[in-house]
C-alpha cells in the first residue's frame, strides 16, 4: 500500500519472490460526467512515480513476479467501471514492463462492481463487464507480449448482497 512498507517487509520477514503493490492514480475517477470516487483522498496505494520506484527497489531485492492492485470506486452500478479500471492498470503494467523489465504476473481489479439498492436502478451486466475487460486485455496487454497476465477480482458485494450476505 505504501512505498515505506518495503523496508518494513524486508526487516520483518524478507522480500518474497512474488509481490503485489497497490496503485493509486490520484485525482478524481470519473466515467462520462459522473464522478465515481476520489482516489486522491484515499490513504492507500502508491502514486505512479512511487510504484515505479517500488518496483525498481523490489526487483533489486530479488522479486521475480509482480502484481498490481487498485481500488478506485465502491459499489459502482455501471458496466464501464471495470473495463475503465482494467485499461488503467493494463497500461500501467505495460509501462512497468517496458521501462523496468519486470514480469507482471497478475493484475487484481479488486472490487467495486456493485448492486442496485433500489428497484429503479439498472443492475450491472456482468457479461458486458467481462467483455469490456477482455477487449481491454486484448488491445493493451496482448500486443505488448503480456497475454499471460492473470486477472483477479474481488466481487463480494456483487455476488453475495443479492442473497442477503455482505
Name each region found by the language model.
Residues 74-166:
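C-terminal active-site-proximal or functional interface alpha/beta core segments in diverse enzymes
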Amino acid at each position: 500500500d505504501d512505498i515505506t512498507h518495503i523496508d518494513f517487509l524486508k526487516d520483518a520477514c524478507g522480500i518474497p519472490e512474488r509481490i503485489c503493490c497497490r496503485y493509486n492514480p490520484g485525482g478524481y475517477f470519473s466515467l462520462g460526467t459522473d464522478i465515481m470516487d476520489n482516489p486522491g483522498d484515499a490513504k492507500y496505494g502508491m502514486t505512479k512515480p512511487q510504484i515505479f520506484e517500488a518496483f525498481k527497489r523490489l526487483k533489486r531485492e530479488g522479486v521475480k513476479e509482480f502484481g498490481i492492485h487498485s481500488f478506485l470506486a465502491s459499489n459502482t452500478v455501471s458496466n464501464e467501471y471495470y473495463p475503465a479500471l482494467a485499461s488503467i492498470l493494463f497500461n500501467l503494467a505495460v509501462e512497468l514492463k517496458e521501462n523496468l523489465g519486470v514480469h507482471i504476473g497478475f493484475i487484481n481489479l479488486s472490487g467495486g462492481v456493485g448492486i442496485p439498492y433500489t428497484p429503479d436502478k439498472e443492475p450491472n451486466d456482468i457479461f458486458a463487464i467481462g467483455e469490456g475487460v477482455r477487449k481491454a486485455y486484448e488491445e493493451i496487454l496482448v500486443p505488448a507480449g503480456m497475454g499471460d497476465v492473470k486477472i483477479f477480482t474481488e466481487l463480494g458485494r456483487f455476488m453475495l448482497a443479492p442473497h442477503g450476505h455482505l
